[in-house]
Amino acid sequence: GKKVIFHGKEWKSLEFNLVKIETDKGITGWGEAFGYTSWKAVKIAIEEMVAPLLIGKDISNIPEVLLTLQKSLHLFGRYGITMFAISGVEIALWDALGKEKNKPIHELLGKKNKDLFKAYSSLFRYGDPKIVEQKCKQSLDDGYQAIKLHEIENNCIEAGRKGTGNLPLMLDTNCPWTYEETMAKKDFLKNMKLTWLEEPIYPPEDYETLAKLNKELGIPIACGENACTEFEFKSMIKQKAATYIQPSVIKVGGIYEMYKIIQHAEKNNISVMPHTAYFGPGFLATLQLASLMKKETYIERFYLDIDQEFYPNFKKAMNGKYKLPSGPGLGIDLDYKRLSKYEI
């Protein structure tokens, strides 16, 4: 099929920043920071900005550590590279703390409400109707009961609906349109019977316009994968920008920041559908947080085969669902030896 192009290059690799911390008690914690083509910048931010603030420090109170990091580094920006770096390290701290206390992270945060989660297959943007339909059918054969497209052309979206049948279909367009362009597609999009329309406009933080679409389009709006910190999500929720918010734990500031976002969303009767287009500690961190949610949620699973799985038992959803692992920390420890040959 067509080559998948990302930021001007053929997309052949998927880079993530794997974060390892070691405590003076000999405990190792693993985290994950957003990478892709920004991985080098995030790596430098972790090494030069975040790590010096933590080495030799007491990390038993992670919420306090998170606040210190955010306050100390705010002059470098409250979202983007800085927050990606903080997120990865903060996840590793929780993993280490859970292992030290021999408890899964969700037990350190609150009361578990569920341990089985519906999953949806999140497809690439293929730009070819035949491939889209084929990938949808393949996802269903693999047990997924819902699918998310990243297409923007009508014929590809129609192919996705055809391949998915009557099961839930989501559409993430990655911010290509204006308000007017989105409204011009209203009848077509409504006919596709979408569960949600994700990030239809640019810029993604134009919450006022998203709120108009959420009210006028007749399709629930989802957004938030590019937002950071609880304060940005509070603004999003206050303006009624979305029916579904989508924080990404490896972007927003880590586990505790996302926990606060979930708490605020549920107080305002907003559903959280986490952004989880990754395979490492960030995926497990999301499951830990999802177990605390009172409202129903979906877990996103990027639909592609990678050369080496972080956690082989989580390669695919079983009968369209993922089960919360029961071990301490993130639930499963990472076997780095299997991954080390992919280090860059």
Describe the role of every protein-language-model region.
Residues W11, A277-I344:
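Flexible C-terminal active-site loop/helix
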